[in-house]
A protein has these predicted regions:
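Short terminal alpha-helical segments
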Residues: 2-53, 110, 114, 130-140
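Amphipathic coiled-coil alpha-helices
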Residues: 24, 31, 57, 61-66, ...
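Amphipathic alpha-helical interaction modules
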Residues: 38-89
């Protein structure tokens, strides 16, 4: 399911890093939306809401801080009692296999994205004005 191979060249600057992260973001959002549809089909509204929130959070993330927050949110459902690992669809078989496959793909791609954020080229610092307006200072000249 995941379009991103482990044999990719490492980004050499922030622009390349951003393009890679945007690709991860689109794929994660797509996988999460696919999960939402599966869970909705099986009336699992609580888990559906969690994956819907993740799809929205990762899709709207504009900074590494926001990306990491979304990744930590989705990774938090994978441990402890009553976690995603303890859950299964009552309609076993193909639906449960799809749930497991999507869940694993989301977890692994989010982990890969987090590693890339931590180890790859760093995001440039933004001024308070840029943070407040969401714009680059260059867009005004």
């Amino acid at each position: 399911m995941n379009k991103f191979s482990d044999n990719e060249p490492e980004p050499s600057d922030w622009q390349e890093q951003l393009e890679l992260l945007q690709g991860f973001t689109l794929e994660l959002q797509s996988l999460a939306q696919e999960m939402v549809l599966l869970l909705r089909e099986h009336n699992e509204s609580n888990w559906e809401k969690i994956y819907s929130n993740f799809a929205e959070a990762i899709g709207n993330s504009k900074s590494n801080r926001q990306r990491l927050k979304a990744i930590d949110y989705i990774h938090s459902i994978y441990g402890g009692m009553g976690s995603w690992n303890d859950f299964y669809l009552l309609a076993l078989g193909e639906a449960e296999e799809q749930r497991m496959s999507l869940g694993n793909a989301i977890y692994n791609l989010a982990k890969k994205m987090k590693t890339q954020i931590i180890t790859g080229p760093k995001e440039p610092k933004r001024s308070i004005w840029q943070k407040l307006t969401g714009r680059s200072s260059r867009s005004y000249f």
